[in-house]
């Protein structure tokens, strides 16, 4: 079920009235659903733009069309038009399922480690142009990672590994006892912090 607040409905209705196109509504879709890059997209939709398989939600003065393939990802979504502490108003969309759900505790350790790496660790490393890939997860809970991008050859990779990645994985995935680096950092060609300049 998707909730759209009265304020958001009023906001959309005014925008649609300004466009002056008969039958215009708003289409909601999930982009890159089930991934860390997932996002919700809202756009005007004229009747000719619709494919016919959208879910239609009647709102005050317009229809919200949800792209059929996006419906499972938008379950529980909330659309609101809020006033921020600065006084500015902003449309917000909260879609708790859009990035997928963490694997259940019954899932393999490999699945749980990969999910945390892709959904929690890599988005943080991306701010430095870096990433890590899970190379192996041993039966006794040792995770072997390979750094890439700005982390490949970075002088702070050891700190990132021990204080960031290992701490996160050990805290989020029961059974992980250590995290090790399998990267040949000497071959990194664009490190965020060159190894010879790291403190």
From Swiss-Prot:
It comes from the Bacteria. One of its GO terms (molecular function) is iron ion binding. It holds the Pfam family NifU. Keywords: 4Fe-4S, Iron, Iron-sulfur, Metal-binding. Binds 1 [4Fe-4S] cluster per subunit. The cluster is presumably bound at the interface of two monomers. One of its GO terms (biological process) is protein maturation. Homodimer. This is Fe/S biogenesis protein NfuA. It comes from Xanthomonas oryzae pv. oryzae (strain MAFF 311018).
